[in-house]
Amino acid sequence: MTDERIHILRDILLELHNGASPESVQERFDATFTGVSAIEISLMEHELMNSDSGVTFEDVMELCDVHANLFKNAVKGVEVEDTEHPGHPVRVFKDENLALRAALIRVRRLLDTYESMEDEEMLAEMRKGLVRQMGLLGQFDIHYQRKEELFFPIMERYGHDSPPKVMWGVDDQIRELYQKALGTVRSLPEASISIVKADFEAFATEFESMIFKEESILLMILLESFTQDDWIQIAEESDAYGYAIIRPSEKWVPERKSFVEKKSVEEASQSETVDGQVQQVIDTPEGQFTITFTPKEKEAVMDRNSQQAFGNGYLSVEQANLILNHLPMEITFVNKDDIFQYYNDNTPADEMIFKRTPSQVGRNVELCHPPKYLEKVKAIMQGLREGKKDKYEMWFKSESRGKFVHVTYAAVHDETGEFQGVLEYVQDIQPYREIDTDYYREIE
């Protein structure tokens, strides 16, 4: 991969940005490239968004469809072992896309049939069927959440931070188009079928385009970058988010290879001297040599069960962890450098109000949220950091879960008053809202 090639790719997108027609750019692209890797696309977007070229995140989002179409017939495939095995995250991801496309086709056919149907009784049944199929199709949001919360953090660790931002922004646009389409479907027969079909096709066009981007660009980046350990982590954390329409037919358990070499009979021997130094005999082609050195002291490993001063008493690390995990709320700590550093484990991952997984730990808090919420996240962090407020409180009702959720973002300061980070705690207060007496002290 050469810098020149990346610059040409960048120039092509800048031409589009400045009004060039896709046809004229296509000709130059075909004349220049015999194939383009997903890594190059990633680097190109990163360069565009972080240069002084004038291209912004929003511009790249607008160009996303255009450049994806340009690359459609020129993306090099990547072969990686095990990806077609049932339960592998890549296989699961592709199987979900197949199931989602099938649901989309069913909705499209129902709409076409509805348009030509005249029997009122049949039309009523078809309306019910449309709502059911749209609900099934709506599970794409689970597919997107797993992508955003499990794939994107690992991509960022490998330096691919621009593609997640762009794709997450487009995901949110698709979600909005779906909600609009669902609303018009539910408004039948009051809404005209032509409006319903137009809203659905607006969603379907972007949705099918995203499937291409996922499988022809996103997965190529992942397959070029991710290790087997990365895929194992994703597979282990996927249950917390669930699956769209279908579940993996089996658990993926890859064959692990050990990279620890067996000790050789001729391996160098060591012996400790009186003064604590170590002598080591090394075999080389020129003969044996003896070297003497002072070994590095091993760091003491903290005992998680040893008691130590803790606030107004004594606790072990293990006890402190148990207490945090038994608090009736979800806790997240973001340190003063805006890094997501900790969350407690008080409920199964699939039952969390705000889902958290180990792969999110260590990320910048801004990358943990959809682009549309970025300004609000920045405002909260800045307000708490600068002392404008000690805390921010929010609440909302979740009808689907039967919960009334209360969220608090509180500034954390040390004894000197220095800002150390933000503590978020989330709890379901619906049980407290249902208390209708002034007194209860029974133990039944």
Q: How does the language model describe each region?
A:
Residues 1-141, 145-392, 396, 403-405, ...:
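Small-residue-biased structural context
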